[in-house]
């Protein structure tokens, strides 16, 4: 991505083509320019591989004629990936790539992770052996909920660590039993590897002639559009379904009657529909807060949901007595998956392919930061479209084929909040990505 400005300048006529939708997002524009550069490089390599002429003439007539179509397909397809909205997009410049994660740790490179959960107020107030004189009742930090102090302030369920005395500090390092407490860091790596998808189509010259004569359509162009649209749709659904599969179960026990299920009849405590829908909104906020607590990156800010749940979220504002709570959500299964912004913060996306029945409502709340590196899942395109045109050796009828290469990679911190879990390679494990929380919604009406 370091050369994206150079790529954008080179591909400016394509990026700003008047017949194509404008790319308003600067990062989408940068990624598209890198992918266009990858596409051109791949096409040149294919030309050289397939040429049967002298080495000085690296041109393949069956491939070079298709470069403009490929460039056009890439330009139209790449900005429309849903991964830009619900995940991060990091283009690859080679078939494999490495993601590095640095973790701060207590004591040694294999110690517990620091700077993730609450800082240990006791760690720097004692020596490496764990002893210090501080004049207070405790030298160890314990507990996570200060509300227990109201029940029994002296019970010791919530304690703090404090600084050591001057005498103890002066004695640090004077012998092996009085060493400084120590910290370290570890560098861990994850590997993302490009995988492939491939489709082909065949047609006859007679079909191409008749289609052109009767409908004015080019058979090769239409089939190329069909194949590329199918590949794009499959990638979109893979990203969405991977997030569904890998998201943690939301609505934990204690928040709701049944863990993972928000029942509007038993959990919202509302008297009528809008009050129940507001209970649903509050539960969604709790899942968003849980993402912040689990990742220490930020509250959840994106929602993927079924159409009826989105409509319920809309009604919670539209049907309320306060017009200021109008959420301006546009719910349409047949149109754009982006429905609108909820409460000025959540971007709501409708999944038009999810089962929209009384027993199958759900929502997934996730977090995606302003930086492309701040997400729970990354889509890593390498070569978006490779097109090959051939002729059947027996029938002499034309054939075309498409291939694409990309990787899916989970955030290295998505499953390793304490730093002790194994390094993640690939999209990660089911029910383990803490950047996303998945909840079933029952008794919506």
Residue ranges and their predicted role:
Residues 219-220, 235-258:
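Short, glycine/acidic-rich hinge or "gate" loops at secondary-structure transitions
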Residues 92-95, 193-195, 295-297:
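Extracellular/periplasmic catalytic domains that process cell-envelope and extracellular macromolecules
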Residues 1-19, 246-247, 261, 319-321, ...:
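Short, intrinsically disordered N-terminal pre-domain segments
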Residues 63, 74-81, 97, 101-238:
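Acidic/polar, low-complexity extended loops/arms that serve as protein-protein interfaces
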